[in-house]
Each structure stands twice: as structure tokens, then as C-alpha cells.
Swiss-Prot record:
It comes from Escherichia coli O157:H7. Homotetramer. Mg(2+) 2 binds at residues 268, 271, 307, 309. The keyword Transmembrane helix does not apply. GO terms for biological process: D-xylose metabolic process. This is Xylose isomerase. One of its GO terms (molecular function) is magnesium ion binding.
Length: 440
């Protein structure tokens, strides 16, 4: 079959002085960073949905891209053509992983039986493509939010028959992910929330969602899937309020239903923006709670109240994110999935490469800067100094539960405590970070 991207062989690393827009300037897969290949640190993935499924339509306009596989025709044949182009893209871009929703790769069909049969055929196609290319599946998931049946949610739907349909999709998608060697399975509750409390039973919906997640965990163990289950937090859109608002909210939910040891988090940069947080905050929070799993690397727009899903281009922001990830030991089963799309006006097919190349260079440069911060150790040293009092006898007695509130009140009076505030030196530390960014 003729190549779709016929004007490009493969994207290659050419160094920072290259002016070739279809070459990497900073991402060198084989470059060693802290003793590990850059490719192994970053674990890049391209997503099926934004890259090959979105046709450029938005709230105010029809599709603008005119991709060959988005034309009228036999649904399975078009899905196979889309898979051909997708794996050509993955190969030429040098991404080791990809991600999908079930209906990204397979036609949904007119019935549950058609859905299952279509998906089974496409899983065989994908398995063959993976074997030919060496590209692996980072994670799979089920789209339980687009079809009108999910207008009031999937697991939180007031109709148990809708709940059951969603369960079928998740079973099918998880088993497909398992068959394809996927390293994670993602649960994003696109409509697991509410539009108004006037018709919503919050307690009931939380119980439904909790039971659904428990069943997902049960099925994972039943089929022997060894990958990581991931929830992807998002505060709103398409619903007004979603139950997986942010990392801290999801932690509380998991604790409520006894799932905190079974499920981790897939953190998306743009979702952090919508929740009123920095990307850095959400990553650091997930790590602090022991829930860090994977990343959807993109960016939002603080001036817009929706999920713009732009490609990451801020080295400053992502250097701090990669610093937190490296300090925590790096990715295990997770990676950096580009949940990002070209703009509607970017209608040239090679714009898909420009977006991903820039994003991969951004994250590669961020990784190298983060590695410098790790090797220098100055930030860690400053934080250790700031909290050093907790290593004292008093600090350790408090943390080990050896002193009560009344004991502390007595201690403070007996020792005539008069602590003096120590400077946080925020400005100096910001200058230090700029030194790593611009002077190293």
C-alpha cells in the first residue's frame, strides 16, 4: 500500500543547530541521561484519537481535515486504512508506544454484538501491526462518554442497563489491552459527574462509581492482567462537575472504596489547568500520595475555560515536572502520551509531525534540565535544610505519636519556646531554577 506520508522517510535527530523542521533537535533516543537512554526515560506515546480520529470539527464548524479514512465507506475497511496510516506515523516518528480508546480503532456498530465482533477483528489487525513495527501499546481504554446513551454518565448513570453496557465495553477493552501487551489500562470518567444537583443523588452516584471501579479491579485480577490501572482526573467538561476532579479528590474516592492500593493516576497537564492547579502541583501531589502512574503530556490555555489539548511547548513548566518524576524514580509502566491535537487551521498532514516533534523536543530538553537539577542537588539540599527541625528529638517524637497535644503545650511552656520565622527564600530558588534553564 502506498505510504500516506510519502514525502518523509523517518524523523531523525540532527542536533540543536539543525534548521530541518522534520528533525529532532533535542530528542536523541540513545543519549544517556543519568545512566539511562533518553527513550527509556521518556517512554513517548502518540494517541489514536486526536491524531487520527478528530476530523477538525468544533462547536462552530464542520470537519476541516478531509483525511482519506474519514470519508464515506465500509467501516471496517476504513478502520484498517486508519491503522495502516497510524503505524506508518508511529514508525516514522520513532515513538515506542501508542494509546487508544476502543472506538478509535474499531467501528462501534449498530449493536453490542457488532461492537464486540468489530473490535475483535481490529485487535488482530493491531497485533499484526505491533509485531511488524515493534511499536507497543502503552495503554488502552473504553470510550464510555461519546455515544448518546452515556448522556448521564456510564458508571454513574441512573439506568443500570447503561451501567451494564459500559461494563461490557470495559471488559472488552481491558481484555484487548491485555491481549495486545498493554502496560496500563486507563479509566477516564468523561461524563461521571453532574450538570445540576436538582436531578442528582450524589451519594447514589458515588456508590455506583465505587462499585464499578471495584469490579474493574476484580476483572483485572480474573484475567491475569499485570498492567497498572489508571484513573485520569478532570474537574469538568463535558459535565459541570466531575467526581474525579483532581489528584487529591481521586485519592479520597479511592480510600473510600478501598482501592488506593489498586489504582494509580494518569495526570494530564490541561486537566490540571482546568482544576486551577499547575501541572507541577498535580504531578507532585500524585507522587506524594503514592498514586503516580503516567502522564498525558499537553498544555491548556489559562485564558480559556475548556480543554484545548495543545502540544506541550514550555520547557520551563516541564523541567519541573520531569524533576519530580526523576526524583520519584521515573516511570515504571507509564509514560508520556501526547494527548494533543493540531489546531483546526493546521490542515497539512505533516502538521501532525510538526506538533509531535516540537513536543518531543520540549520534553527531551526538560528531561536534560531536570537531570542537571538532580545531579546538582541544590534544591533538595535547600528543602532538607528547611525541614531539618523535624529530625530533632522533638520533631521525631511528634511524628512517631509519642507526644499528645497537651504534651506539646506543656513542652512549649516549660521550654519557653519563642520560634523565629526563617526565610523561605522563594526568589532565590526561582533564580536558581532559571540558572538551570538558561545558563547550563
Amino acid at each position: 500500500m502506498q505510504a500516506y506520508f510519502d514525502q518523509l522517510d523517518r524523523v531523525r535527530y540532527e542536533g540543536s543547530k539543525s534548521s530541518n523542521p522534520l528533525a529532532f533537535r533535542h530528542y536523541n533516543p540513545d543519549e544517556l541521561v543519568l545512566g539511562k537512554r533518553m527513550e527509556e526515560h521518556l517512554r513517548f506515546a502518540a494517541c489514536y484519537w486526536h491524531t487520527f480520529c478528530w476530523n477538525g470539527a468544533d462547536m462552530f464548524g464542520v470537519g476541516a481535515f478531509n483525511r482519506p479514512w474519514q470519508q464515506p465507506g465500509e467501516a471496517l475497511a476504513l478502520a484498517k486504512r486508519k491503522a495502516d496510516v497510524a503505524f506508518e506515523f508511529f514508525h516514522k516518528l520513532h515513538v515506542p508506544f501508542y494509546c487508544f480508546h476502543d472506538v478509535d480503532v474499531s467501528p462501534e456498530g449498530a449493536s453490542l454484538k457488532e461492537y464486540i465482533n468489530n473490535f475483535a477483528q481490529m485487535v488482530d489487525v493491531l497485533a499484526g501491526k505491533q509485531e511488524e513495527s515493534g511499536v507497543k501499546l502503552l495503554w488502552g481504554t473504553a470510550n464510555c462518554f461519546t455515544n448518546p446513551r452515556y448522556g448521564a454518565g456510564a458508571a454513574t448513570n441512573p439506568d443500570p442497563e447503561v451501567f451494564s453496557w459500559a461494563a461490557t465495553q470495559v471488559v472488552t477493552a481491558m481484555e484487548a489491552t491485555h491481549k495486545l501487551g498493554g502496560e496500563n489500562y486507563v479509566l477516564w470518567g468523561g461524563r461521571e459527574g453532574y450538570e445540576t444537583l436538582l436531578n442528582t443523588d450524589l451519594r447514589q452516584e458515588r456508590e455506583q462509581l465505587g462499585r464499578f471501579m471495584q469490579m474493574v479491579v476484580e476483572h483485572k485480577h480474573k484475567i491475569g492482567f499485570q498492567g497498572t490501572l489508571l484513573i485520569e482526573p478532570k474537574p469538568q467538561e463535558p459535565t459541570k462537575h466531575q467526581y474525579d476532579y483532581d489528584a487529591a479528590t481521586v485519592y479520597g474516592f479511592l480510600k473510600q472504596f478501598g482501592l488506593e492500593k489498586e489504582i494509580k493516576l494518569n495526570i494530564e497537564a490541561n486537566h490540571a489547568t482546568l482544576a486551577g492547579h499547575s501541572f507541577h502541583h498535580e504531578i507532585a501531589t500524585a507522587i506524594a500520595l503514592g498514586l503516580f502512574g503516567s502522564v498525558d503530556a499537553n498544555r491548556g490555555d489559562a485564558q480559556l475555560g475548556w480543554d484545548t489539548d495543545q502540544f506541550p511547548n514550555s520547557v520551563e513548566e516541564n523541567a519541573l515536572v520531569m524533576y519530580e518524576i526523576l526524583k520519584a524514580g521515573g516511570f515504571t509502566t507509564g509514560g508520556l502520551n501526547f494527548d494533543a491535537k493540531v489546531r483546526r487551521q493546521s490542515t497539512d498532514k505533516y502538521d501532525l509531525f510538526y506538533g509531535h516533534i516540537g513536543a518531543m523536543d520540549t520534553m527531551a530538553l526538560a528531561l536534560k534540565i531536570a537531570a542537571c537539577m538532580i545531579e546538582d542537588g541544590e534544591l533538595d539540599k535547600r528543602i532538607a535544610q528547611r525541614y531539618s527541625g523535624w529530625n530533632s528529638e522533638l520533631g521525631q517524637q511528634i511524628l512517631k505519636g509519642q507526644m499528645s497535644l497537651a504534651d506539646l503545650a506543656k513542652y512549649a511552656q516549660e521550654h519557653n519556646l519563642s520560634p523565629v520565622h526563617q526565610s523561605g527564600r522563594q526568589e532565590q530558588l526561582e533564580n536558581l531554577v532559571n540558572h538551570y534553564l538558561f545558563d547550563k
